[in-house]
Amino acid sequence: MGVDIRHNKDRKVHRKEPKSQDIYLRLLVKLYRFLARRSNAPFNRVVLRRLFMSRTNRPPIAVSRLIRKMKLPGRENKIAVVVGTVTDDVRIQDIPKLKICALRVTDGARRRILKAGGQVMTFDQLALASPKGQGTVLLSGPRKAREVYRHFGKAPGTPHSHTKPYVRSKGRKFERARGRRASCGYKN
């Protein structure tokens, strides 16, 4: 007699609306749902899907990365579109003239972009300026830059593992003996 397969965890999660109750986000969803339905542009469908995403899947993007991505050939005079936050980067001295559209822009980043003669748009302004996403470049931040990703992967302590262990402290007495030195058992 076989054991029945458990079906309790085999659903594919597919968001149909954002989890957030933010009314302004909901208005954007309403707008882009209309655009995605009425225009056959894949840009609007992608923006709509990204508006549904959780905060961890909408990582912030720094101004420095934005500049680097917009310097690539064929991207001059285009609008950089970020479904997320644009943050400032103090390591960059001079910012070129940028035209960006984002959900949020930090005060420092906004000040520096506007000072350089750039423009900061909201998504409803973008819908009027570029309803089919023409003349835009969709960008996103690095998802795996979060500190938590350092703890994922092969178990810490196994050979060739660079995974960060969850330890209380980095002192002499914490995860420094067995497995780390030949005199205590073995060395990986």
Curated annotation (Swiss-Prot):
Residues 153-188 are annotated as: Disordered. The keyword Ribosomal protein applies. GO terms for cellular component: cytosolic large ribosomal subunit; rough endoplasmic reticulum. Its main location: cytoplasm. Keywords: Cytoplasm, Endoplasmic reticulum, Ribonucleoprotein, Ribosomal protein. Residues 161-171 have a biased composition (Basic residues). Component of the large ribosomal subunit. The ribosome is a large ribonucleoprotein complex responsible for the synthesis of proteins in the cell. Belongs to the eukaryotic ribosomal protein eL18 family. This is Large ribosomal subunit protein eL18. It comes from Oreochromis niloticus.
